[in-house]
């Protein structure tokens, strides 16, 4: 799944530069892509030369679950969207179990409570927001920015939340879940 989320949120650099402040943010998430896979692509398909994507500013983050070292797309996307690690299958909500480093320890009253995403923050600031996905928009990573659910497969609930997010642009699959009869 390849996923893009964009916002009109302003970023604040540590120091003001001569060029000013960023006006817009576009986040590209090639879900499941690894540095090893990119390196192999350079060597096999591009004779070791840089790829076009190498010109894009990028970074790496640790998106392990709150309770296991390997994350699937839903908790991995939640970590990217909210800055909070969560458990397998959860999206956009606090975990019940948080035992690994960099995981928030929650009080029992906070289990499964929603955490705001960067997209929701941008919308609350009056910015234009949107998501673009090569999968269904209610799939794991795109939905981490636009919904809160106790299971990544709750497509009907997730879709309803996405409709009421008032996104300005939405491109992706999932038409079946957007029809009124479903």
Where are these regions (language model features)?
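Bacterial N-terminal signal peptides
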Residues: 1-4
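Double-stranded DNA-binding cores of transcription factors and transposases
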Residues: 7
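N-terminal catalytic scaffold of extracellular/periplasmic and nuclease hydrolases
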Residues: 10-181
